[in-house]
């Protein structure tokens, strides 16, 4: 989508109330989009609405609910769809997980991406639309202290690639791309895991420029508007986007 076309376009962001989702919603709003932010907790959504004004619409809903994706796509007809919602994994080694805690990210992260990508293809979204899913760098290297998290994030990358292939096959003109952010102490979830891995390895918490929600927001906006960013998957670090094949 050319940069001038984002002005007035509807962008729907799941998991918009905190962390990366909040940064993404803010960046898209500042770029001129009309942003629909979806999250279960309405209070932080309303706080974001107070910050962003009329360019932001707060929707309190469970993004993993099988009925929500179709309802909101029909209601708002987004041109930009950012699938960021996810559960917080428990920081413990595999032997201390139950299947319920181990599979938490499959039940939330993967299920929500499945429902929304399915509805984006079935609706379908308008030609020229962009669907961005938030996977994780853990999908490349694993994450032994977070149960099924890494596998769930790898599944999200696969689902996104499958959807891209279906869009091409059906000539729908919908772009699907996955983003794999590195672990960062700049979010509440990331800070817990950075500290946990440092303690496990008996090292200090790594220093250096972190991947902040603001940087993530700018990267997602660049993916939507930037010429040349046409790959199907990108690793995202504090240094920026890097294609993954």
PLM regions and their residue ranges:
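Amphipathic alpha-helical dimer-interface segment in Rossmann-like NAD(P)H-dependent oxidoreductases
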Residues: 74, 108-129, 165, 169
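Catalytic loop of short-chain dehydrogenase/reductase
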Residues: 130-170, 180-187
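Rossmann-fold scaffold of SDR-type NAD(P)-dependent oxidoreductases
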Residues: 14, 78-86, 109, 133, ...
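Conserved glycine-rich Rossmann-like NAD(P)H-binding loop of the short-chain dehydrogenase/reductase
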Residues: 31-47
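Conserved glycine-rich cofactor-binding loop
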Residues: 10, 17-18
